[in-house]
Amino acid sequence: MSTLALPHTPGCLVCGRDNPHGLHLNLEVDPDTGIVQVQFTPTPNHIGFQGIVHGGIIGTVIDEAMVWAATWNGKRFCLCGEMTVRFRNPAKISRPIFCTASVDFSQPRLISTNAMMRDEHNTIIAAASGKYVPLDRERNREFVATVLDDVDQENQVAAMLRAAV
C-alpha cells in the first residue's frame, strides 16, 4: 500500500507541531482506497489507570483518523457529528498501537466512517463508527486558510482533496 502523508494543522492536539501538549502524530492515506492510518506509542502522560491508556486518548486518535478518511472522501474538511467507540482490550503504555479508518458510505451532507485500533500483536483495542459532516465550500476555504500554516501546505491540501477518490 503506497501512502501519502496528510498535512498538519499547527495547533491540533493530534497532529499539530506547534501544540506543546499535542501528540504530534503523522497520519497517512492510501490514495487508491482512501484508508487512513496512524501509529501511536502512548507515554506515561497518557495513563488513565495503572498503565492503561486513557480511553479519551484512544477516542481522540480514532476521531482524527476517521475525520481524515471523511475529509479525503468528501473532498472537504469535515466535522464530527457523532462517534461511537467500543473498547475491547486495554492499550498499554509504551506499546505501539495502530489505527486505520475508512468510509462506509458517503452522501453530500453526511459521511459514515469506521475505524479499528490494534496493538502490535493485532489484538483489537477499540472499534469505532462515526458520522461526519462536510463543511460547505465557503467555510471549507476559510478553514483551510485559517488552520494551515503556509501557502505551500494550503496548496498541497487543495491538490490532495481534488485528487481524492
Language model features with spans:
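Short beta-strand micro-motifs enriched in acidic
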Residues: 28-30, 102-106
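Detector for glycine-centered tight turns/loop "hinges" at secondary-structure junctions
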Residues: 34, 75, 122-123
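A conserved, well-ordered hydrophobic junction motif at loop->secondary-structure transitions
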Residues: 37-61
